[in-house]
Amino acid sequence: MPRSVNAVASRARRKRVIKLAKGYWGRRKNAWTIAKNAVERALQYAYRDRKAKKREFRRLWIQRINAAAKMNGLSYSQFMGKLAASGIELNRKVLADLAMNNPEAFKEILKKVA
């Protein structure tokens, strides 16, 4: 009996990986083993960095809020504490956007919490 190999599934799997490797440099885009390794590593980086992106943006928003608050005589922690105590429920993303693009509105919020 001849050896049974599922060539259709194997070819589909290889095509999928080679398609994901499109745009890579050198043999990474067309040599099966090298492309497989490159795509696997790229997917690991993508997974890791989707998580890191959330942390990085939070850090950026905090830095922007801190800079705007310090220009008005408050530290970040003092500002956030007073914001929570006053019952204003704005998240860091919105506060950072206001601090950057609409400083007058941010100053109004500072006046309300102080």
Swiss-Prot record:
User: Which keywords label this protein?
Assistant: Ribonucleoprotein, Ribosomal protein, RNA-binding, rRNA-binding
Q: Which Pfam family, any one, appears in the UniProt record?
A: Ribosomal_L20
Entry-linked Gene3D superfamilies: 6.10.160.10, Ribosomal protein L20
Single Gene Ontology BP annotation: translation
* Record-level GO cellular component terms: ribonucleoprotein complex; ribosome
Segments crossing the lipid bilayer: none
GO molecular-function terms, A-Z: rRNA binding; structural constituent of ribosome
For this protein, the record's PANTHER family field holds: 39S RIBOSOMAL PROTEIN L20
Tell me, in a sentence or two, what this protein's role is: Binds directly to 23S ribosomal RNA and is necessary for the in vitro assembly process of the 50S ribosomal subunit. It is not involved in the protein synthesizing functions of that subunit.
Which family is this sequence assigned to?
Belongs to the bacterial ribosomal protein bL20 family.
Name by which UniProt lists this protein: Large ribosomal subunit protein bL20
Q: Which organism is it from?
A: Amoebophilus asiaticus (strain 5a2)
Tell me the gene name.
rplT
